[in-house]
Amino acid sequence: MNYIFFDLDGTLHQQDMLEAYLKFMIRIRPVWTVLSFPILLGCFLFYLLFSKKTWGLNPLFFMIHFGLFRKKQIRLIQAFKTEFLDEVQPVNSMLKQMKQHIQAGDYVVIISGSLQSLIETVYPQLTKHKKIKVIGSQTQPFLGSTILTSRCSGRNKLRLLDEQFSPEKIKFEVGYTDSLADLPVLKRCKWAYLVNENGKITLVN
């Protein structure tokens, strides 16, 4: 059995799910956004400076979710799912490619910087498929809010992958992504491809 790596955002669909979710949460709570605007602005600037780090996003993530009870957060995530699916632009050629790999008996591993809980909600058909494993960023409750405990990006993708399949360090037959930020994972791929916004692939040497 071959393992196949797929990124999600920019590869299987064009949008950045985590970015769309953060914008949704800011927009859906206008009163809270206005009252906390100076703090949110500071958190956003902090994120721009340290965008690749888990702790770089956490102040903004904490403020956006502050004061939300779990039931309310679940309702908002369901509302986000409806809005996101109405607007998302799938990369059909890559979805077809993934389907072909599965039909050939391959095991697909989707590793995404988006929240794993969001992916599971928006795309339950992926997370429930016996030939697909989804790995994403992790969160946990913290002081009346929610924070990221692990950001699934860059080298962290490789760490989370190895944790999921420990003690085996799997190698991929083929890998697909839209970004060379996934180079640590691509180095585990026998064949690695970059995907453009039209779904066309280019071999990475």
Which residues are covered by each model-predicted region?
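Short leucine-rich amphipathic alpha-helices used at interfaces
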Residues: 50-51, 93
